């Protein structure tokens, strides 16, 4: 059965979250581990692929093949200075095939595989989709996915592609300030217009948005931020600090050469950082961190604030910029709402509060779940959902960066200015630069600088077939059409001849082609099938193990063993021991082999147990002494110590 609504997914740098609107409210859905946020981690091993908590839990043992931070790579080029700088901190390998697209290389099932950041993100999205499906009991096809407000066009497109690869129809890519909906619905409507500043500092990105909330209308006035600032950067500072501390305490031993040691240290640093939000000092203790040397060190909150001081202070500039862009004085801001796990850091809170003259900050919404909450509300509205609470609700979003084309001399001529409400459409007339020019080469840029060389090239196209004419005579109308996803279509028309050409900005260099997306969708299905096969294999193995051990326990029960012939008892014990021995030396056997082995064991056990049972004059019902009911024990065999329809307990490796 398919769910007729849509889910809201917050695809985060470090953690992701999923929500759905049901019964007049948003439910944030817990994953299979009972956690309401899921680590954005994917791990590859010799036998399986792990996503979420399972991936993060084994990272110290498998650092080279555990991928995280895909959001810091998505929509970027390999040679981007940001990517090059991040690569120094990542234990996994990032390469390129010469086209400047970053590729992540891992060992999976004994061979090297490469994945695009979109594919890794799609695996996290798939996990969120499965989490929602387990909760709803229905198949989910549609979703709204959030991105930082300051994401550029190629990063948005790449995120949308990731959704497609995960088998989702992405109804809308929305900016994370949509979390304001969570705040707005929480506050209720008091009939007054309120200016609200959303300050969102997460695991890897930072956004500031200024909104006016009036009734159900949420109008984004301005947005700013840094797509590369968050909790991970604070962790990096701590890792560097403790690496030096370790070197100082241990005669120059440099643990930076060991990815495993670094990973263990990073996990401890993340924990220490969280501790420092509520305590004034934190201690890290790691046994055998590097070259069998134990490490213990303490850090105070004051030292942490000094280490990250410049990063904390850098969050204020975007706040100043949004106020400037919205032409608003900071005294006119009614509420400052904190979102994102990193806003729990006391120094960040005091900096923001001081900037607003000691204003009390609003912490009423859960910083980890607010984005998914807003996305779930949007998903409900976009699939035609009707509710008293969402009636009249309208989110007017804006484009974060100026969009324009290059004109003579490399000048950036803006058509859509930053912080313009979207969707929007703007046209402007241009002409030729030389006499008898047969065509024009239109280059589309994104950015705030006066010259295009300092802006980001989105795409190019040609308009040819212009009739010969003196320069400045032909009239070429260029139209920019920016949709609600923040994705751009550009067209150009020569007014005299009606010749027309257009481009959907797909940033060909950084963007996946249709064929690549199709290939990745098929790969994703294959990996999903592999995961399913692995689950079935483990279930068959557990089924055999449970059956063998429950038989062994039954034979150990005096009520049963006393009623069996010695020869039958010896036969059963021998057969069970042979099976258990086979199991211990065939941990990687196929599902069919486990099932076959179980049938073999059943063919010996069932007749003997049935004979004993009949000699006792019993018929129907379960066996005495905790003996499982054999009638349910066919083929893929059930759980131990009960009928095969009972609950299954997974073995934890």
Swiss-Prot record:
Signal peptide positions (record): none
Keyword Ligase: no
Keyword Transport: no
Extent of Gly residues compositional bias: 633-644
Matching Pfam families: HSP70 (PF00012)
Molecular function terms from GO: ATP binding; ATP-dependent protein folding chaperone
Annotated region described as Disordered, given as residue ranges: 616-653
UniProt entry keywords in alphabetical sequence: ATP-binding, Nucleotide-binding, Stress response
Family: Belongs to the heat shock protein 70 family.
Name of the protein this chain belongs to: Heat shock 70 kDa protein
Species whose genome carries this gene: Leishmania donovani
Gene: HSP70
């Amino acid at each position: 059965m398919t769910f007729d609504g849509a889910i809201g997914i917050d695809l985060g740098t470090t953690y992701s979250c999923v929500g759905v609107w049901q019964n007049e409210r948003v439910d944030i859905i817990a994953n299979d581990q009972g956690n309401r946020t899921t680590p954005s981690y994917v791990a590859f091993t010799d036998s399986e692929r792990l996503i979420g908590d399972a991936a993060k839990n084994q990272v110290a043992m498998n650092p080279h093949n555990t991928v995280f931070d895909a959001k810091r790579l998505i929509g970027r080029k390999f040679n981007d200075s940001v990517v090059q700088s991040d690569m120094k901190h990542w234990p996994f390998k990032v390469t390129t095939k010469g086209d400047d697209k970053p590729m992540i290389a891992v060992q999976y099932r004994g061979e090297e595989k490469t994945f695009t950041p979109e594919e890794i993100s799609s695996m996290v999205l798939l996990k969120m989709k499965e989490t929602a499906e387990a909760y709803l009991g229905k198949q989910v096809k549609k979703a709204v996915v959030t991105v930082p407000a300051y994401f550029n066009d190629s990063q948005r497109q790449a995120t949308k592609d990731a959704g497609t690869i995960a088998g989702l129809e992405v109804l809308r890519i929305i900016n994370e300030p949509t979390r304001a909906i969570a705040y707005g619905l929480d506050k209720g409507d008091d009939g007054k217009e309120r200016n609200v500043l959303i300050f969102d500092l997460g695991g890897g990105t930072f956004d500031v948005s200024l909104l006016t909330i009036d009734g159900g209308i949420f109008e984004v006035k301005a947005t700013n931020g840094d797509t590369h600032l968050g909790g991970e950067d604070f962790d990096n500072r701590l890792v560097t600090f403790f690496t030096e501390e370790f070197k100082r305490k241990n005669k120059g031993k440099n643990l930076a050469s060991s990815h495993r040691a670094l990973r263990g240290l990073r996990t401890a640093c993340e924990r220490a950082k969280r501790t420092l939000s509520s305590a004034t000092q934190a201690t890290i203790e790691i046994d055998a961190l590097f070259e069998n040397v134990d490490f213990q060190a303490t850090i105070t909150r004051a030292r942490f604030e000094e280490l990250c001081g410049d990063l904390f202070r850098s969050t204020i500039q975007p706040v100043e910029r949004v106020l400037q862009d919205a032409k608003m004085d900071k005294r006119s801001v009614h509420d400052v709402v904190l979102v994102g796990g990193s806003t729990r850091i006391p120094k960040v809170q005091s900096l923001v509060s001081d900037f607003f003259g000691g204003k009390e900050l609003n912490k009423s919404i859960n910083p980890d779940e607010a984005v998914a909450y807003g996305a779930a509300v949007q998903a409900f509205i976009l699939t035609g959902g009707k509710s008293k609470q969402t009636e009249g609700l309208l989110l007017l979003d804006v484009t974060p960066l100026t969009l324009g084309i290059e004109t003579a001399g490399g000048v950036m001529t803006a058509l859509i200015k930053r912080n313009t409400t979207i969707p929007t459409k703007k046209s402007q007339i241009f002409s030729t630069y030389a006499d008898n020019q047969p065509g024009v080469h239109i280059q589309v840029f994104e950015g705030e600088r006066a010259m295009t060389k300092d802006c980001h090239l989105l795409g190019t196209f040609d308009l040819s077939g212009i009739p010969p004419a003196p320069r400045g005579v032909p009239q070429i109308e260029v139209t920019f059409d920016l949709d609600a996803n923040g994705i751009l279509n550009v067209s150009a028309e020569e007014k005299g001849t009606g010749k027309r050409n257009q481009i959907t900005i797909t940033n060909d260099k950084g963007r996946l082609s249709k064929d690549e997306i199709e290939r990745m969708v098929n790969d994703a299905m294959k990996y999903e099938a592999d995961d399913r096969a692995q689950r079935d294999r483990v279930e068959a193995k557990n089924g055999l193990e449970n059956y063998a051990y429950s038989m062994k326990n039954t034979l150990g029960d005096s009520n049963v063993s006393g009623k069996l012939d010695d020869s039958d008892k010896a036969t059963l014990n021998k057969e069970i021991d042979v099976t258990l021995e086979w199991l211990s030396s065939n941990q990687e056997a196929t599902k069919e082999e486990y099932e076959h082995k179980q049938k073999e064991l059943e063919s010996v056990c069932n007749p003997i147990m049935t004979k004993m049972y009949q000699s006792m004059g019993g018929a129907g019902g379960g066996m005495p002494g905790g003996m499982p009911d054999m009638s349910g024990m066919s083929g893929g065999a059930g759980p131990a110590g009960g009928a095969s329809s009972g609950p299954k307990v997974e073995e934890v490796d």
